[in-house]
Amino acid sequence: MGSAEDAVKEKLLWNVKKEVKQIMEEAVTRKFVHEDSSHIIALCGAVEACLLHQLRRRAAGFLRSDKMAALFTKVGKTCPVAEDICHKVQELQQQAEGRKPSGGSQEALRKQGSTGGKAPALSPQALKHIWVRTALMEKVLDRVVQYLAENCSKYYEKEALLADPVFGPILACLLVGPCALEYTKLKTADHYWTDPSADELVQRHRIRGPPNRQDSPAKRPALGIRKRHSSGSASEDRLAACAREYVESLHQNSRTRLLYGKNNVLVQPKEDMEAVPGYLSLHQSAENLTLKWTPNQLMNGTLGDSELEKSVYWDYALVVPFSQIVCIHCHQQKSGGTLVLVSQDGIQRPPLHFPQGGHLLSFLSCLENGLLPRGQLEPPLWTQQGKGKVFPKLRKRSSIRSIDVEELGVGRATDYVFRIIYPGHRHEHNAGDMIEMQGFGPSLTAWHLEPLCSQGSSCLSCSSSSSPYATPSHCSCIPDRLPLRLLCESMKRQIVSRAFYGWLAYCRHLSTVRTHLSALVHHNIIPPDRPPGASGGLTKDVWSKYQKDEKNYKELELLRQVYYGGVEHEIRKDVWPFLLGHYKFGMSKKEMEQVDTAVAARYQQVLAEWKACEVVVRQREREAHPATLTKFSSGSSIDSHVQRLVHRDSTISNDVFISVDDLEPSGPQDLEDSKPKREQEPGAGTPGIAAAEQQSVEFDSPDSGLPSSRNYSVASGIQSSLDEAQSVGFEDDGAGEDGSEGPATAAHTFPGPHDPGQETLAPASELEAGQELAAVCAAAYTIELLDTVALNLHRIDKDVQRCDRNYWYFTTSNLERLRDIMCSYVWEHLDMGYVQGMCDLLAPLLVILDNDQLAYSCFSHLMKRMGQNFPSGGAMDSHFANMRSLIQILDSELFELMHQNGDYTHFYFCYRWFLLDFKRELLYEDVFAVWEVIWAARRISSEHFVLFIALALVEAYREIIRDNNMDFTDIIKFFNERAERHDAQEILRIARDLVHKVQMLIDNK
């Protein structure tokens, strides 16, 4: 039962977190939050659910239906803030009910921001959550919730969320941010609509289909001048633009209001075909009222890439301005209702079949409201108390007399004819109507051409000529046409000159491409079809043949298959060590076993070293903890501690560590007398126990205020420890990283290597030996080294705890293995240390390889490339510069858009992509596929293939970015929402095409 209650409380709190995130994002992206925003209503609903959870009946009131009112009223007796909210809500309710409040109440409302002494009208949703909403608008909701959490015993049961010692304060803290925002009442142009989500933008783009892209820049531009509206490409672009505008108009935006929308409305476009379901919508703009109907096939994007089929369904779509409609025929049947629109020329539009459920009446009601105040329906709809709008009760006329249908018991009329009339413009077009009724339809065209005829030549000889293009030799109007001819000749010269200089700029552009982008790709193009079969990838059969006969299979051919088709999942465990450099292609099994043995011995040695150092670190924490509490309880060193925090390095994590400068030993010799006592299992460094210890005590780090004389580099600290202790060093073998040396800090021989397959903790005897060894070797560690190790252990523990916990593989035992591997790598690279994100790179390797030693070796090889992306390296700046060059050359239109909208051509939104090789952008299965292609591309096409994947991600959504005119904030929000929803195979295909395009540009073929 307890677990079920906890699950309910976690769900309630999670809903509040989600709504708080939404409202904070709106405040950042739109620079304001309107009081009528839907996010405010959603947040109030989530908070109200938390406040009502397990509320005592006495606090809620036995007979009151409004429990929130009872709660605030009861709390207001002892909480002044809640009492003020009660007064303000009472005033708002009086305004909503139409009763005029007192003068003092009007003054209070005027202070809230109402203008002219009139309070703004509240929507029904705002009235529903008026108590929580008012507290939020007054910026005191967090204080009210905090008061309820502190006095929960008066108002809540023991199982309530606010009675929980953890969840209650968390809820109050979550509301601090929304209570700090400024809410506006200003009616802005985009007040009635909110920015669509990434999913909705993608859905809109899918409806209208991908328009044609611009020509490839690899082709030399033609010097011919393309005539407007004469080529097929121009018409296709125009149709694509029309389709885009049509789809955007279906949604509510700043220009139009959506009055009505209903799906599955049937229309029969032709007599010989079945009715087609579609989406019917009614839109109101400043000038007109428009009805639109779109087939469901277009709305759902289920037509694929068949342009012919799409064009057919686009022909079925309806766009009907109501300024052209004079009457509406309505027919009611048991299966629903049918509506027929009749135009001014008497033509009937295709019938619209509404489903059952009163949808026809609902549409007419929205139409009548949209026609006001300039137009109206004749006869108007009736209003019936308790039901709202109803059809008018009319009498049917017979040839003999008027018969009341209802009196005869037959029932109400089922067929209606409504006229659309505009009382103020009734006789505006009478003249035109008379002409058309008399049969002079062509006179309308003549009326349109009249202004052109009036501007004709005044020369009688020209006007009397039989041909409009023939000019008599004796014509006197030739001087009038001479400036026009000179203008045409001048335009011709300008066009030719512009074409020439464009061609010259293009040639110079190609020269720039070859100069700056030649290093990004291999010049030798390796196609997928020579020999064929590379698109199928590296299969299990091909790999088994390679293992049987390594000599007849070339490494480049295997990598080509991986690059174009990936690796079959069953053999990834065997192939990845080759791709990462742990094994070399062509190695025999004996040579591979030798490499594995050397790596296992190396890993166990490093594991023993840092675990021995960890014992000293934990012992140092336990000794410093009591004295630290005493020091802070006295309050004597708080000011000095704050001063030391000012000198923290800003590049390190913002975690606050308690300073123990005054308690540190004066030198390593003081540590020799202190033997660490075994108070925990050797797994004390595991995430769970380490996290528990971190809550009780933290210690000083190199970036938490140490004196400047001790803030020298980590490498110098390690070297001093080596000199003092005369410790034993070791060199990297061939399987480890080239040129890297691990810090040898122990002065004695370390325990032997553990069993490579063992996942449990070491035996107690080995642990005791390691503890004694750590006590003996404590003098080998300088304070700087211990601080550095402790800081990195803290960061690793914090990151391991939250690393992909939703993925099935990462159980507690596997997280412990992940920590051991990461600590071993960081121990060998203390100059770099641990940086957030390294666990994300190690986790997929451990999932596939499922071997600690192998994952450690492969991760070390991977970090040779990825380590440069972290702050200690400089690869990130070069990535941004190369991305700028690539997109400027391959997609100049999108580059200009980025430059105009706040100049986000620095591509900082790609930082996480490059840092983690797109690990957080893709699902785990897609991460495997993308990573192996990146590794194979280093030999096949480009050592910088990550650039082309990043560019492919941008190109995949370029039309959405361009059509919505996204700025830097919008594009970050868009890609964050699209994380783990990308089509990885499509992204890889685009990336490979981009590489080939750059290769062709350089080769100029």
From Swiss-Prot:
Keyword Cytoplasm annotated: yes
GO terms (BP aspect): late endosome to Golgi transport
Top-level taxonomic group: Eukaryota
Domain annotation Rab-GAP TBC: ranges: 566-938
Localisation: Cytoplasm; Melanosome
Cross-referenced InterPro entries: Rab-GAP-TBC_dom, Rab-GAP_TBC_sf, Run_dom, Run_dom_sf, RUN_SGSM2, SGSM1/2, SGSM1/2_RBD
Boundaries of every RUN domain copy: 34-191
UniProt modified residues of type Phosphoserine: 402
Basic and acidic residues bias (residue ranges): 672-681
Pfam families, alphabetized: PH_RBD (PF12068), RabGAP-TBC (PF00566), RUN (PF02759)
Keywords: Cytoplasm, GTPase activation, Phosphoprotein
GO molecular function, one term: GTPase activator activity
Keyword Transferase: no
Disordered, as annotated region: 95-121, 205-236, 657-687, 729-761
Acidic residues: bias regions: 730-740
Tissue: Widely expressed.
GO CC term (a single one): melanosome
Record function comment: Possesses GTPase activator activity towards RAB32, RAB33B and RAB38. Regulates the trafficking of melanogenic enzymes TYR, TYRP1 and DCT/TYRP2 to melanosomes in melanocytes by inactivating RAB32 and RAB38. Inhibits RAB32 and RAB38 activation both directly by promoting their GTPase activity and indirectly by disrupting the RAB9A-HPS4 interaction which is required for RAB32/38 activation.
Family under the similarity heading: Belongs to the RUTBC family.
Assembly with partners or alone: Interacts with RAB4A, RAB11A, RAP1A, RAP1B, RAP2A and RAP2B. No interaction with RAB27A. Interacts with RAB9A.
Domain notes: The Rab-GAP TBC domain possesses GTPase activator activity.
Protein name: Small G protein signaling modulator 2
Organism: Mus musculus
Gene it is expressed from: Sgsm2
